[in-house]
Amino acid sequence: MPRCISRELKTLSVWVLTLTISGCIGTGGIAPQGEALSPNQLATDEAIREAARDAHWPSRQWWKAYGDPQLDRWIEQAVQDSPSLAMAAARVRQARAMAGVAEAAESVQINGEATLKRHNWPTDQFYGPGELANTTTWDNNAGLGLSYALDLWGRERNASEQAVDLARVSVAEARQAQLELQNNIVRAYIQFSLHYAQRDIVAATLRQQEQILELAQKRLDGGIGTHFEVSQAQAPLPETHRQLDALDEAIALSRNQLAALAGKGPGDGAGLQRPTLALGTPLKLPSALPAELLGQRPDVVAGRWQVAAQARGIDVARAGFYPNVDLVGSLGYMATGGGALEFLTGKKLTYNVGPAISLPIFDGGRLRSQLGEAAAGYDIAVAHYNQTLVTALKSISDQLIRRESMDKQQVFAAESVAAAQRTYDIAMVAFQRGLTDYLNVLNAQSLLFKQQQVQQQVEAARLSAHADLVTALGGGLEAGNDTADLSHAPWRGSLLPLDCAAVPSGGCCAPKREQAPSPRC
């Protein structure tokens, strides 16, 4: 047999033996079990279907619907100065940097090294006698080392894609933090406004009580009243003053809360003036399709990217079962003896190049455990994503039901205040004419006070319901894109799913670098 053929057969035998041995470590029986929901699998209720008429998304700066310039400025400052958003932004930068580290592993790695040193060569059992025995010479070298992962099984590529997907998760989480901050500021601002409205009611009640006391005193002085009536008129005054003081405290605390939410000190909050909130046309929805309702929510987007990242993790773990082949080489100069720079001459040139192969054979089950962990991580991400979808659609329905209820309650509350006001006016006229005692006036006044408080609470709840609904929808669209077309959504093209490059064994779409998992996942 020719020598060259024999050599090739030996090489082939080595490869066959290697692959046979590697079969001792297999991926059999390990696969993810989770299956992600499609949003359209979730049925919508009557509240969502009713709201889907004359559809228009809120604008990106949705809080401007309240028509309060002070609120607009405060939210803009909060987005710039909030420590919580600064942390979220730092996490985004950190994740992007980690993605850069992972992507670098796909590139050629080149390192330079140089050593200049004096070397004493002894005569002993290691060196032995020779030309360099008992001499001191230069022992120098300089060169470039090169390595490149051929990535035959996609390990490095999938690790890089996974890091990019995790970076996108951090972006979506940062958007979620921003949306929650905006919602918290709006809700705190609404409570700030409510305290002012409640104070107006209490202050008006105090003026009424003082007028009644003055009238009771005049009736007593005129001989048609009693000391008991005067005492009755005086009794509620201290409590009303206490309520005024409590509301002043609540207003001051609201200022502090708004300042803290914006990342500012109490001194900045002290400059806040009374809110002027007025909500216009109710918010409509783009359609009754859950995929469109949920597509903007940052937590849903983050969940999808997390599923994509875990799918990449499975591919990374699976690639570990196959041989790893790197191309390595070096080019440089080296010399022992001669002058200090003699090693830089052409005749001292040295180089090497070739593949470096590593193959797992026996590892005590480590690789199978890693694959099992990745598959379980995928199942966890899918389950979390499914729960996020269910919770998100429930939240939208809850806020729509709440908003509709608040609109109805607002009408009833206004009617109750009007009726209580008429009752109080009649009681006051009767008391002034001596046709009734003070107790009827007090009861009528208490009823009016209660109904006015309820009316303001309902109005505050209606304003809060709007903010909560916008938050449940994931915020608004950019100005000028106030349509039902979600292709203009702020996450579209950078975070929302488009299409899939491949479908791994886990059953979920593995997206391309610039894409997220398919809505089918």
Q: What do the predicted segments below correspond to?
A:
Residues G145-S147, V316, A356, G474:
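Outer-membrane beta-barrel architecture
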Residues I25-N184, V325, G329, I361-L371, ...:
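Short flexible linkers and secondary-structure junctions
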Residues I75, N141-G145, Y189, Q234, ...:
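Membrane-embedded beta-strand positions in outer-membrane beta-barrel channels/transporters
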Residues L220-I224, F431-L435, A472-G476:
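A short glycine-centered flexible hinge/capping loop motif at secondary-structure junctions
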Residues P2-Q80, Y127, N140, V164, ...:
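Terminal intrinsically disordered/low-complexity segments used for targeting and assembly
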Residues I25, E156, D165, A172-L289, ...:
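Periplasmic alpha-helical coiled-coil/stalk elements that build and connect Gram-negative outer-membrane
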Residues R3, L12, S487-L498, G507-P511, ...:
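Short, low-complexity intrinsically disordered segments enriched in A/P/G/S/L with frequent Arg
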